[in-house]
Amino acid sequence: MTGTALKKEMDMADIQNSEAFENHASENNTAWQKVCTKADLVAFSGVAAWLETADGPAQVAIFYLPGLGQGKGDELFALDHHDPFSNANVIARGIVGDLKGAAVVASPIYKQHFRLEDGQCLEDEDVKLRTWKVKFKGDEVWVEG
Amino acid sequence: MSTQQQLIIIGNGMVGHHLVEQLVDNGALERYQVTVFGEERHRAYDRVHLSEYFSGRDADSLALCEAGYYATSGVELRTSEAVIEIDRNSQEVVTEQGRYPYDRLVLATGSFPFVPPIPGNDRDGCLVYRTLDDLDAIQAAAENATTGVVVGGGLLGLEAANALRGLNLDTAVVEFASRLMPMQVDNEGGELLREKIEALGVQVLLERATQRIEDGEASRHRMVFQDDKVLETDLIVFSAGIRPRDQLARDCGLEIGERGGVVVDNQCLTSDPAILAIGEVALWNQSIFGLVAPGYQMAKAAFSTLTEGDTQFGGADMSTKLKLLGVDVGSIGDAHGNQNPSARMFRYLDPIKQEYRKLVVSSDGKKLLGAMLVGNNSVYDTLLQYYSNGIELPDEPASLILPQSSGAAPTLGPGALPETASICSCHNVTKGDICATIDAGAVDLGGVKAATKASTGCGGCTALLKSVVDHELEARGVEVDKSICEHFAHTRQELYDIVRVEGIKTFTDLIEKHGNADTHRLGCDICKPAVASILASCFNEPITDAAHIPLQDTNDTFMANMQKNGTYSVVPRVAGGEITPDKLIVLGEVAKKYSLYSKVTGGQRIDLFGARLEDLPDIWGELIAAGFETGHAYGKSLRTVKSCVGSTWCRYGVQDSVGMAIQLENRYKGLRSPHKIKFGVSGCTRECAEAQSKDIGIIATENGWNLYVCGNGGMRPRHAELFATDLDDEQLYRTIDRFLMFYVRTADRLQRTAVWRENLDGGLEYLKEVILEDSLGINDELERQMQTVVDTYQCEWADAISDPEKLKRFRSFVNDDRPDPSIIMTSERGQLRPA
Ligand SMILES: Cc1cc2nc3c(=O)[nH]c(=O)nc-3n(C[C@H](O)[C@H](O)[C@H](O)COP(=O)(O)OP(=O)(O)OC[C@H]3O[C@@H](n4cnc5c(N)ncnc54)[C@H](O)[C@@H]3O)c2cc1C
Ligand code: HEM
Ligand code: SF4
């Protein structure tokens, strides 16, 4: 459900921003892409990134929880920036925390919680955000999309 | 029994309704087809709290049951239909609409206010105080009145006087006897009461018998007294006692007492065994009981009689505790000590604090027979327990009424009460009943209340009930869980104390030291903003500093309120609502440049909506350059100080309300608190700034400022309560400093002052003791803390736009400069709005 809602919006966005879109569309759809550096991230919080994927553009929320994975990775998470409950692109601006053992982000609009691990909404089992693979390469942040 | 019997109840007041509840709850409707006649328009309502009608409650919230209760229970309720005759021969009651047969009949007609037979007592604007309709009439009459008089200085008279005062009338009380509340207090107590009430600006005239009421010269009426003295007034409320509504019973020949009242026995049966009487209309053992608790007990006895049970009515305790015009008055048992010839009395009078307490004890000094309290009811609950449970008094009974500091005065803890101790007298709930519900599975106060109804009557036992329930739960090893969330086993107040005492300055430190070990110690959207607010209240470091930024709600993070489409609003501070034309022009120009929707708020400033995240720094840069600063519309903090135009322009104003509002707004701006705080300042009693609906309301007087606290608008409006009078500017700042800091210190997260105040044990009196009398000895500290916050104020936006590190978050995407393309606007009435 989330996917189609997002897709539809992006179609409108494409029309609005066709110039910008073309610029990006000319890029190669590689599996892993660099989005930013560590300095762009905010520890224990999120930032949003614009991603071109094979399925079209996507807005991705990237969260950085230093120390959470105790050195085994697991300290970067990437999921939909789009909040399916409010239909606004705001997830990266939510508060990060842990509930019942899982790291979560709370939507800043209506406060539902989404598991960072897999995007699952804790309040509504039918709702799940998309997730992307994300990792550090040195100081760079790379997302597979 | 094949057919149902017809049971008719006349009167849908408090007691009649209680009987219906008994019948419904105990399955008696299989046997009886019940019809209730009520003369009033409204279904049964809480007459005890009638006066709250003037402080914002309406008929629906005062009602004793949901609107559909009667219909769904299968009881026929006929409101606005008075019974005009009882025909005992044919066993029928008669109304204008028809005749209705009965097998059993219950009279629950209550009483009517006695209006003394004074010529002129039926003039327009001569009213009584008993029903919702009476209150509507008073309110209507008060519209174009400036003065009001209450005839009768008893309990209800003083309550009516308070109501008139609340309607902004200059109020006087005229009493026939030589003291106020002659039934409840003695001469010394009455004198103290008079002083206190006069200090509130209510005139008290004693030993005045009104001879006649005629046209006045300056006002609508003139009251002429026995010595030809006169008093002019626009409105008169008679409250000279109540009389049982026994006319129906008289007309059909039931036995009536000499001074009125339908005679009943222990089963509440009248002289006709088919007919019962309960509540204020019933006369038992030569007594009328003018309180709701005995009425409820009669209803229970009547239910028992109707169902062949054996519960009887055996008289009732008339002990009462009240707050009249803000003055505590308590009376227990034989308060005058004139029913027990051998009784001995202890008296304590504090002429400075204006408190009076009297104990009436048995000749051996072991039992409490009665007590009287004026000015301070804090020992009432304890004394009542000694009295009603016959608990042996301590060796020095006087210690019970001496001030706390002079030693002893042990309050009876909940553990010391016997099982039979009555906790809620309205619903006759004992400590034993409470223990039983807990043993049967109730796990909190709400559960106990639902199961026993305790504390749902007059509410006088709320604090006692809570302490008994908490005590019993703890005794059973139930941890009363007050944790803020799964990360901390502490309340907000405890976290606040920890932060202050240990000087902890970051969330990370706090959760490391005091967080629950079995979580990831990341916190959550409950505890993080709460701790952020505590840290800001204590240390006032910018909320956008690196250590604090992940704690903030998005609104605080971006120092703007997120709207439903992900854009933000911009609200610069306009202290007191005063703004220069030049600044107005800047607001207009900025709004135009960034395509912002503009609206004037109820807080007397201008809200610009639809700002994109990446535009916020530029918008604020321009605003700050023009001399604006952040308005904290996003924060749990001071919002606005609303003001009327005041004495500088207004012909009625007595003080400069705008000047004061600006002073206050600038003093408290930036204070982070458990929830938002709103102020209002009015320049005279006309109250154009609606200050009494604010957390802090200030109304100018000839001599300074009256301070009101803990008001609220919104879903559950609450009038602010008068806290201190005639303060000068300095006193006003100091009192507000203390009040706000005490609130910041002790409230729960997201608890507005109104709710905080309602949950505060000891209520307004306690608050006054702490803030005005420094009973906790913390006022210096509270003032110091507030001064620190005032001294360290800096505009968060000014701080942020000068720090590139902080500005880095103000873009839609880390890797792309484009704005979020899915924000789409459309136009309406010449401005943009979300599509
Ligand atoms: C302002 C105020 C404050 C009070 N404060 C307190 C307090 O703090 N504590 C306390 O214990 N008590 C207090 N009381 C007293 C308490 O309200 C009464 O004791 C209680 O309401 C009595 O209940 P009742 O059912 O007997 O009478 P009511 O509640 O008066 O009900 C009687 C009903 O019968 C109706 N009726 C009468 N005749 C007929 C008829 N012929 N046909 C149909 N209907 C009829 C009346 O209209 C009325 O609605 C207060 C009362 C007032 C007015
Ligand atoms: C649960 C109830 C309420 C919520 C959640 C709420 C929320 C808000 C929010 C978010 C704003 C800021 C708007 C913005 O700038 O984006 C606001 C402003 C305002 N609200 Fe409320 N509000 C509530 C109840 C009330 C009530 C009951 C009143 C009045 C009695 C009120 C009066 C105002 C005023 C006057 C403003 C503008 C204040 C200013 O100028 O900063 N609000 N409210
Ligand atoms: S409250 Fe008084 S001073 Fe203020 S505007 Fe109204 S009338 Fe004038």
Predicted regions span which residues?
Chain A
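N-terminal pre-ligand scaffold of iron-sulfur
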Residues: 2-102, 115-116, 128-145
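Short cysteine clusters
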Residues: 83, 107-110
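Active-site loop/oxyanion-hole signature of alpha/beta-hydrolase fold enzymes
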Residues: 125
